[in-house]
């Protein structure tokens, strides 16, 4: 914990020289509750941003469920806590280069909405497969499936934010990305609660993992149904 706190302080200090160039808004800029409603309404009014918002909801929800329940799920399957924790930390590491990779692919080679659609279907299949785990599955096979989860459900952030920023009109990048991310927070708060409810009702984890895959499938369908990428929005 102390090391994590020290790292936060180090990052804060390293960012200080950039404040003069990036933090140009006046500290007296008024913050109104109506700004939240305006931002959400503006995001929902544009089809591409609406799709991104739902994707952020589904992706962040899936991520939150995986992070919250994976280790407990493994121990319920009879795996030692140390082994479950070690596997978790290993597969989580895949997300670090994954976030950079997908943003790079979407920025230079493949349309961003197609990359997001591929990530959606990838996380739907892999998170659904987690419901099929049994105590007889070898850790190597479990690791292979969960690495796909990490490479999809935990690696979407870079391309999601870059696409939201690209679609935002000039001067509204912060508001638009914030609006999209707000739906992600709703997913992160609600999805683990739904998973917990299904766990209590069914007495097992399988139903929760399968249901968790459904929003991702819908996102994949939405993304692949889109046509050519639109240009930057001039107004919302």
Protein language model features and the residues they cover:
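Symmetry-related core transmembrane helices of the 12-TM Major Facilitator Superfamily/SLC fold
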Residues: 1-14, 207-224
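Helix-loop junctions on the cytosolic side of multi-pass membrane transporters
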Residues: 12-27, 224-235
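Juxtamembrane intracellular "pre-TM" segments in multi-pass secondary transporters
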Residues: 18-53
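Extracytoplasmic gate region of multi-pass secondary transporters
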Residues: 47-100
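Interfacial helix-cap and linker-helix signal at transmembrane-aqueous boundaries
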Residues: 74-75, 105-106, 195-203
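Helix-to-loop junctions at the C-terminal end of transmembrane segments
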Residues: 98-111
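C-terminal transmembrane helical hairpin of 12-TM major facilitator-type secondary transporters
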Residues: 112-160
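A late C-terminal transmembrane helix in Major Facilitator Superfamily
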Residues: 165-202
């Amino acid at each position: 914990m102390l090391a994590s706190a020290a790292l936060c302080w180090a990052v804060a200090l390293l960012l200080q020289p950039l404040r003069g160039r990036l933090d140009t808004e006046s500290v007296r800029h008024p913050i109104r509750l109506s700004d939240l409603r305006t931002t959400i309404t503006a995001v929902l009014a544009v089809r591409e941003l609406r799709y991104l918002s739902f994707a952020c909801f589904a992706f962040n929800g899936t991520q939150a469920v995986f992070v919250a329940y994976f280790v407990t799920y493994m121990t319920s399957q009879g795996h030692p806590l140390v082994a479950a924790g070690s596997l978790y930390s290993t597969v989580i590491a895949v997300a670090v280069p994954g976030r950079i990779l997908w943003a790079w692919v979407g920025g230079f080679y493949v349309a961003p909405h197609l990359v997001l659609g591929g990530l959606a279907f990838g996380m739907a299949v892999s998170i659904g497969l987690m419901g099929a785990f049994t105590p007889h599955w070898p850790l190597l096979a479990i690791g292979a499936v969960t690495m796909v989860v990490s490479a999809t459900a935990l690696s979407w952030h870079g391309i999601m934010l870059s696409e939201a920023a690209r679609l935002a009109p000039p001067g509204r990048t912060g508001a638009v990305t914030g609006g999209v991310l707000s739906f992600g927070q709703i997913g992160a708060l609600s999805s683990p609660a739904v998973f917990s409810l299904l766990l209590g009702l069914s007495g097992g984890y399988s139903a929760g993992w399968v249901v968790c895959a459904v929003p991702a499938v819908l996102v994949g369908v939405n993304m692949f149904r889109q046509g050519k990428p639109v240009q930057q929005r001039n107004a919302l």
